[in-house]
């Protein structure tokens, strides 16, 4: 697992590039994390750090958690997250982790809980086509059809796509592009949509699967380079048209007229 940050989904907007390119973005407010614990191989069998995010009143904590934060001499934190690291010597208790973590990153993985849709049928939940509208079908147009087997095995296998609770599950969207980040206001702008509703908590991490993809910023530069070439061609066209306009117009019937 790579190190990450916990943030809040503010909403969606769009960003305009210099070339006029419009990009849909999701705005995420990042909370700076504080390293609460440092675990080494001698203690745990692996190197890891425990990071606390968000503030919470001590009155909302139980006695065990109150004692834990008093022992660590730090403010109570709402979320505690553990990340495994390879170079444990770089991290110390009390250090803060912020948006600087993604300074050199182009893509990130974002994990959050999807919006709950309640109990849903197979057509909405699993995109089933349903049964026929007529020709012998009655009161089962949106049903899932048969679910069982024969006498052997005589049961429905686990994982069978059926009607049930839809949404309200943690999902990870991989390789979302970072459009820009605002270090002063702790905001990060990510291309595309992120699971969950407004004000829902999200976990942002460095992308696990490294990909080669043209980013929107690179595309913007290419469009700008093309726009710099095309005005010169347009200038040449305008010059030719202006020269034609300057030529005196021939009067009708002037051919073959003797003076």
Predicted segments, located by residue:
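Extended basic (Lys/Arg/His-rich) segments that typically form rRNA-contacting surfaces
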Residues: 1-259
């Amino acid at each position: 697992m790579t190190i990450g940050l916990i943030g809040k989904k503010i909403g969606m907007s769009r960003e305009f590039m210099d070339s006029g390119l419009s990009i849909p973005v999701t705005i995420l407010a990042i909370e700076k994390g504080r390293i609460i614990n440092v675990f080494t191989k001698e203690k745990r069998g692996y190197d890891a750090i425990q990071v606390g995010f968000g503030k919470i009143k001590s009155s909302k904590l139980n006695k065990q958690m109150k004692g834990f934060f008093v022992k660590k001499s730090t403010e109570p934190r709402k979320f505690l997250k553990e990340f495994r690291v390879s170079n444990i010597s770089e991290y110390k208790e009390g250090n803060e982790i912020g948006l600087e973590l993604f300074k050199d990153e182009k893509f990130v993985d974002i994990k959050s809980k999807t919006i709950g849709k309640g109990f849903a049928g197979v057509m909405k939940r699993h995109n089933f086509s349903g049964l026929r509208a007529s020709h012998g079908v009655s009161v089962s147009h949106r049903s899932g059809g048969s679910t069982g087997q024969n006498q052997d095995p005589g049961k429905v296998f686990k994982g069978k796509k059926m009607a049930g609770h839809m949404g309200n599950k943690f999902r990870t969207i991989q390789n979302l592009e970072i459009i820009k980040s605002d270090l002063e206001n702790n905001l990060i702008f990510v291309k595309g949509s992120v699971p969950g509703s407004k004000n829902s908590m999200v976990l942002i991490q460095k992308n696990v699967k490294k990909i080669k993809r043209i980013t929107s910023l690179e595309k913007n530069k290419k469009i700008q380079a093309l726009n710099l070439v095309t005005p010169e061609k347009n200038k040449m066209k305008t010059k030719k048209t202006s020269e034609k306009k300057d030529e005196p117009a021939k009067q009708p019937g002037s051919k073959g007229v003797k003076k």
